[in-house]
Structures are given as C-alpha cells and as structure tokens.
Amino acid sequence: MNHQTWIQAAQWLSEQEIAIQPLLTLSAAPDEALQAALLQAPAGVLAASAAAVVGCGISDARSVFLSAAAPEEELRAAHGHCRYLAETPEEIRKLDALTGPFLQEGYLEDIAIRVWPNGGGAFTAENIPEFARLIRRMENLAVRALFVPFDQTGDLSRQAKDAFSLVKKIRSDMPCMLHAFCFEGLLEPLARGDTELLQTLRMLASLNDTSLYAAFFIS
C-alpha cells in the first residue's frame, strides 16, 4: 500500500468510529503530509530503520515497532523509542543480548513477535509451546505485542475470528500480558468496502474491549 492510499484508508477507518488503529509500514522518516496523518488520529508504525522510528513523530513507544531484522546499530539507536518485532529464534537471541546493557536491574525489554496462523514463518500456531519456551529462557525479554499475517486469498472474516482466538491462546499459553496486537493485511480490503470484514472487526473490537484490553492495530 502506497502512502497516499494509506492516508485515505486511515481517514476512512477513523470515520467508522471503531476501536481499531491503522498501522503504517515505514522504511524511512515520513514527509510532512504523512507525519501529519500519523498524528491526526491514533495510529501505529512498523519501521525498518531508526530514522523511521524517530521521524514518525509518535511519542508512545508502545505504538511504534522496529523490525529486529534491522542492523544492530539501527536497533541500538532506536532503543527506548519503540518495541522490537522479532520473527525468528535468531532475532529473539539477538534482542536478548542487545537489550541487556540498556536495562535496569529487574526490568525486561518489551517486544513483539510475528506469529503465522497457518505456517510460513518460524513462529506458528502449531509451535506455540516451542517458541514460548525459547522466550522464557531469555533473560531480558517479555512479549507484549503480537503481529498476525493474513492470507489475502482466503476468507478474511473467518481468518480475523481465528486470529483473535489465536491471540487469546498465545496470551494464555505463554503466558504473557499483551499490550497490543496487529492483524496484517486488512486495512486495504477493509477500506475498499468489505462490509462483512467490517462487521467482524467491529465485533472483535468489542470483544477486545471486554477481554484483552489491548491496543488493536490493522495494517
């Protein structure tokens, strides 16, 4: 999704009065128009660089995520301004080693992980016990957010319901205290007028308000 399309979709979402925030993927610092759109209403950012993290203008680090695939110097430069997003065991170990020196005694680094509902990545709905054990072995990390990718060729409404159940299961099985979750790949089809998806997300947003109490993003 290009930036202009995202701005239009984000504006449309805000008009729906639904407790879901749009999330933008950024590789570099945004221009003034895009930054203004990010600050106009609650929104989140998934960044690929420290420049994008700092330049987006969002002050709440819980709404800004930086891919752990970024070079270590980028990860260090962005520390304290975002949450890191890991999707492999190697990235988990890298973050554990990298964040330790930044932390006061007794504190943990809050991170996000990407979990694939039907395979396609290292962390999946089928191997929750394995990646939960891995994360519990880390000295410095605590999972506080989840990213769930969607299959654009499938039934998005059904996937959304399943993804919400997956988020609840991971929170229970790890266990962890979730502050946020993001359903990836829904903003564009939603803004194109998928009414069934809109009704499903309204229902899930309502359930979130009474069960998970987490920030709900879509990208």
Placement of each model-derived feature along the sequence:
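Glycine-rich loops and low-complexity Gly/Arg-rich segments
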Residues: S49, A70-P71, T88-E91, I111, ...
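Non-cysteine beta-strand/loop elements that form the S-adenosyl-L-methionine
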Residues: V45-A50, L66-A70, L108-P117, L141-V148, ...
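Conserved anion-binding
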Residues: G80-H81, E87-A145
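Active-site loop/helix belt of alpha/beta enzymes
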Residues: A10, P117-I218
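Active-site-proximal loop/turn and secondary-structure-junction residues that shape catalytic pockets
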Residues: L26-E32, S49-A51, A69-P71, T88-E90, ...
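Distinct, well-ordered alpha-helical segments
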Residues: A33-L38, V54-G57, L75-R76, I92-P101, ...
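A charged N-terminal "starter" segment
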Residues: M1-R83, D96-G100, Y107, M177
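Electropositive phosphate-/nucleotide-binding environments in soluble metabolic enzymes
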Residues: H3, I7, A47, E72, ...
